[in-house]
């Protein structure tokens, strides 16, 4: 049995980032072998969950993207943006899909934003180095990384302490462990975002009730808007239940 790494999240992420940077594809079995070594045990014996492995993979991809030249160029011309989108699609073709789910994922709708969609949302937000960016439900930082790559000051909030440990590896300007349904009420007064970029849970609420209503996503957005500076921009990725023609 291998000895557990003192920072398994970072260990998995570093191996994944190396693979992505080299343009090599890898399988879920390769990822789980890396996780076995990082955690000093296996999923079967309960040392870590499948979500720990997946989140380590996402962290590695996000770390790579944050410093990649093609990502930094993605905020330029339309041609640059299309090239960035193409490079992201190539990366997605080389990584395993997340076919296994956990109770935590289902209860709190922890479905990470694909890099192609995250880039599109960030591009729409028109982020510059003068901005202060807030991601209220940051997960592993798939949305937040774009602000950092483009020189902005970025803050991320994540309710799950387990996922927050991964997010903290990304080197944002600050992270918080709060319920995004109350983000304006609980964040320090000096956090004044000019941009909010978000992918709120489409229906699930945090806490003991764990109710599933579209109104919960609306509450996330209202709280984020209350915190947004006057003249700021908010870009939200939403489910069909929030569309104008939804019943």
Regions found by a protein language model. Give the residues of each.
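Conserved Class I SAM-dependent methyltransferase catalytic core
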Residues: 121, 212-247
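A short acidic, Gly/Pro-enriched loop at the edge of an enzyme's catalytic core
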Residues: 186-196
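Conserved SAM-binding strand-loop segment of SAM-dependent methyltransferases
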Residues: 172-181
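Amphipathic alpha-helical repeat scaffolds
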Residues: 197-201, 237
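Short glycine-rich, flexible loops that bind phosphorylated cofactors or substrates
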Residues: 204-206, 243-244
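Surface-exposed cleft-lining segments at the edges of enzyme active sites
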Residues: 206-212
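A general structural motif
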Residues: 129-130, 151, 191-193, 231
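Class I S-adenosyl-L-methionine
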Residues: 5-168
């Amino acid at each position: 049995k291998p000895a557990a790494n003192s920072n398994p999240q970072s260990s998995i992420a570093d191996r994944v980032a190396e693979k992505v940077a080299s343009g090599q594809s890898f399988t879920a079995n390769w990822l789980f072998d890396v996780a076995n070594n990082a955690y000093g045990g296996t999923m079967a014996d309960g040392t870590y969950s499948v979500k720990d492995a997946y989140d380590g993979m996402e962290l590695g991809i996000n770390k790579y993207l944050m410093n990649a030249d093609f990502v930094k160029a993605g905020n330029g011309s339309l041609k640059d943006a299309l090239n960035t989108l193409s490079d992201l699609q190539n990366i997605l073709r080389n990584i395993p899909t997340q076919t296994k789910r956990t109770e935590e994922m289902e209860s709190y709708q922890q479905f990470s934003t694909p890099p192609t969609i995250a880039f599109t949302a960030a591009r729409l937000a028109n982020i510059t180095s003068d901005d202060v960016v807030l991601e209220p439900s940051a997960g592993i930082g798939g949305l937040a990384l774009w602000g950092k790559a483009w020189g902005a000051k970025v803050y991320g909030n994540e309710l799950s302490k387990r996922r927050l440990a991964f997010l903290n590896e990304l080197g944002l300007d600050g992270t918080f462990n709060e319920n995004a349904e109350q983000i304006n009420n609980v964040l320090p007064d000096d956090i004044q975002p000019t941009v909010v970029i978000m992918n709120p849970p489409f229906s699930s609420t945090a806490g003991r009730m764990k109710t599933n209503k579209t109104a919960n996503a609306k509450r996330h957005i209202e709280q984020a808007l209350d915190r947004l500076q006057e003249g700021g921009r908010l870009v939200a990725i939403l489910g069909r239940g929030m569309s104008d023609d939804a019943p």
